[in-house]
A protein has these predicted regions:
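Short, surface-exposed recognition loops and adjoining beta-strand edges that mediate ligand/DNA contacts
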Residues: 36, 64-77, 199-220, 224, ...
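Flexible, polar/acidic helix-loop-strand segments at domain edges
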Residues: 343-415, 461
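Bacterial Sec-dependent N-terminal signal peptides
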Residues: 1-31
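Short coil/turn linking the two alpha-helices of tandem helical-hairpin repeats
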Residues: 151-158, 232-239, 430
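Membrane-proximal, proline-rich intrinsically disordered regions
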Residues: 21-70, 593-626
Length: 626
């Protein structure tokens, strides 16, 4: 029998850094949906409970994307947008804003807390296999991810790990945790589970649009969540060892996703001008291993995690993202969110390095091409615009199509995102050359041996040697393969910048700062061909390279992940690493409509974003940074 318990409506009273939960619950709610038994002993109860948690995630799916994208610099709001969305873009969200509802996060958290406290993790089947550990670990990862989203948006939050089931429970006082506290707690909570359970997931077969084992997409891989927790913690503290832990977590996910010592390469997908063509009307999209639009699960698919959306609005958790980003009949073809001038400027500022049909010479695409074909081509491939005509009235109207948000389900994690975060973590860990390789050529053991190890200290070489991308399984595509739009079976690795900006290894405008090369010389003092002398990187050069790569990474996040709901969080994370975090973030956001219009944008937003307190939401005066 299912017992309906309480609804989180969090109204906080803060005393000395603690929050009372006496008004957290409404007894007429259906927010906690577990059995009234002390433990979840059977598969029916356990699976129903996990599905219930996934259902609660649906309520925060849209706002996860919107809060992460609308407050950034790569999208703008149209006149069609509702006032709540407009207030979000202007950092002016009131208590009644539909996207400012912390109770929905705590509904997920409280259900997770109940499950974790009551599931029978010791129960085994007749094959001596644990029955419910997969669910236990999956729910712990969901709880950690949800708390991370909550604190990223509110800055300081009441922290509850026991299920709240009664008024007496609600009247207890709970500590307030900031971002650093949340990260440290859940790193400690999840890390012990990874040796055995990091790659074990519940398997619930086909769920609505998710077929062929794609129910695995509903879960949050523990090593990715740990990577994110460590990356945020390192960005706040500047601790190099924490960056290294983040890098190892992302690497472990990549190297173990399909089994121990398996392969999950970045893939050889890219959008380019047809090699050898100079007419600038002939583009080519080469997709190897699937892209962000494929909601299937396989060894080489791009998508990693989704929050499922209902198929019809009447079901209650229907994602509105497609109506906000994509012209369709359901929104009368009027969208609320479009690419910003900042997005156009970022894309057009890239030098697109084209190659000849033989791959032996290179040249650059013109910088003045129209319809967003200048610079990086990823924007052109995911965005289209124009005008439609009302067949009844003859009225003309603008249409806009951002393909990345045209789906029923809400995309959270994908492969390219994890490689970009691996690069970010490696850069912070003191390996800017390795990070740059992920952007430029792709990273495998050959690159590590030739470009990284010779320039590292012995201890650094020992550490990074844990990253193992064998050439036989992570082969880098050649320029000839790029020119021919083909790749051999094991040539599955490419620099991420090449996905939209041409053949990056040839790009003269995309080079890592370095010292002048040294060569051995003959008796007459002439350099001997092929006798390059590797020089150890100095701390000064490494720091200069780190700062340079950090700026490239933030740009690449924008080029690759635009419109996917990560931009504001990315700017925030990169800002924490700057000497003046507030000024860094403010400059980025105020340039949403171009740097020349930053002053006007600053006046429209009104909030002083150089003050970190204004980065975060508040609710009812009781949650958020004070």
């Amino acid at each position: 029998m299912i017992t309906k318990i309480y609804k989180l409506i969090f109204s906080f009273s803060v005393i000395c850094g603690f929050a009372s939960c006496s008004d957290f619950f409404d007894q007429e709610s259906e927010h906690v949906i577990f059995t009234e038994k002390d433990h979840l002993h059977n598969a029916t109860d356990t699976i129903y409970s996990v599905i219930g948690i996934l259902n609660k995630l649906q309520a925060i799916g849209d706002r996860t994307v919107l809060l992460g994208e609308v407050r950034g610099d790569l999208v703008d709001i149209t006149n069609t947008a509702n006032s709540d969305l407009r207030d979000m873009a202007l950092f002016n969200m009131g208590d009644d804003n539909q996207y400012n509802q912390p109770r929905d996060y705590y509904a997920v958290i409280n259900n997770c807390n109940y499950f974790i406290a009551n599931v029978d993790t010791a129960m085994k089947n007749n094959r001596n296999e644990y029955l419910f550990m997969r669910e236990y670990v999956a729910v712990k990862a969901i709880r950690a991810w949800t708390y991370l989203q909550l604190v990223l948006n509110y800055g300081s939050v009441p922290f509850v790990t026991d299920p709240i089931l009664s008024k007496i429970d609600a009247e207890k006082e709970f500590p307030r945790y900031n971002l650093q506290d949340i990260c440290q707690y859940f790193i400690n909570d999840l890390a012990p589970l990874t040796d055995r359970w990091a790659n074990e997931y519940p398997n619930y077969g086909n769920i609505r649009t998710l077929r062929n084992g794609a129910s695995r997409l509903l879960f949050f891989p523990v090593n990715i969540v740990l990577g994110d927790l460590n990356l945020w913690l390192a960005s706040v503290t500047g601790n190099q060892s924490t960056y290294r832990e983040a890098a190892m977590r992302y690497y472990k996910y990549i190297s173990q996703r399909n089994g121990d010592n398996s392969t999950y390469p970045i893939g050889a997908s890219y959008y380019s001008w047809m090699p050898g063509s100079a007419t600038w009307d002939n583009m080519y999209g080469y997709i190897s291993g699937g892209d962000y639009s494929s909601e299937t699960y396989g060894q080489n698919t791009e998508l990693i995690t989704v929050i499922a959306g209902d198929s019809i609005p009447a079901e209650g958790n229907y994602s509105q993202l497609r109506n906000l980003f994509y012209s369709r009949e359901d929104n009368d073809y009027h969208v609320s969110i479009v690419p910003s001038t900042g997005m156009f400027n970022l894309s057009e500022s890239q030098a697109n390095c084209c190659v000849s049909s033989t791959g032996t010479t290179f040249y650059y695409a013109p910088s003045d091409l129209t319809r967003h074909r200048a610079g990086d081509l990823r924007l052109y491939w995911c965005y289209d615009w124009g005008q439609g005509t009302n067949t009844l009235t003859g009225e003309r109207y603008d249409v806009s199509y951002i393909d990345k948000q045209s789906f029923q389900n809400i995309h959270i994690y994908r492969r390219s995102m994890i490689y970009l975060r691996l690069a970010e973590a490696l850069n912070g860990a003191g390996f800017p050359r390795a990070a740059f390789s992920i952007l430029s050529t792709g990273l495998n053991n050959e690159i590590l041996s030739q470009e990284i190890y010779p320039r590292c200290s012995q201890s650094d070489s020992l550490w990074i040697s844990q990253i193992d991308f064998p050439e036989t399984r992570y082969g880098i595509i050649t320029v000839q393969e790029y020119a021919n739009q083909t790749s051999t079976a094991n040539h599955n690795t490419i620099g991420i910048h090449t996905r939209g900006s041409g053949w990056t290894p040839f790009n003269e405008y995309y080079k890592l700062p370095d010292v002048e090369p040294l060569f051995e010389v003959d008796e007459e003092g002439n350099p001997i061909e092929g006798s390059y002398i590797y020089q150890k990187d100095t701390p000064e050069l490494t720091q200069r390279q780190k700062e340079f790569v950090d700026s490239l990474l933030l740009n690449e996040n924008g080029l690759e992940l635009a419109f996917e709901g990560t931009r504001f969080y990315d700017i925030m994370r990169f800002a924490y690493r700057q000497p003046n975090p507030g000024q860094f973030l403010a400059d980025k956001v105020y340039a949403r409509r171009g740097k020349a219009n930053s002053g006007a944008m600053r006046g429209e937003i009104k909030k002083d974003l150089t003050d970190q307190r204004n980065w975060f939401l508040q609710w009812n005066g009781q949650i958020g940074l004070q």
